[in-house]
């Protein structure tokens, strides 16, 4: 007789693709820590939803479309209130986690004056090598013979910006790894 205990995680990500990619390291950490014995309910905007296509542990996907007067939160509450979660990770700093049946709440509150990557790493104790590996492996499987990379050294908000030297370092690293073309 084998008993498999699942963690039920409610993961509320972003509407933007870039933000969702940043948040993905946290989801990967939960998967790694729970040895894939995890069931995830994902809430995300429609644009970044394909990022999660290969995540088989996502049992429910909810596209959150913003509405006037924040009515999207009431709609989301109606959709999720029948369920119980072991933990919520909320990158939108919403109040919904306080109204749902959740054992543990991780509400990410961005400090506008600090770097977002450092804030996420400190709050969730992510491991850059291990927690980005799932995404990297998936991209390699989708594009096995690709030999190019795209860098986008711009953001829509100052705390997400990296110093120019970081992009130069990434480009050098990619070239050292055999990338022939880098598009900016």
Regions found by a protein language model. Give the residues of each.
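Catalytic machinery of carbohydrate-active enzymes
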Residues: 1-184
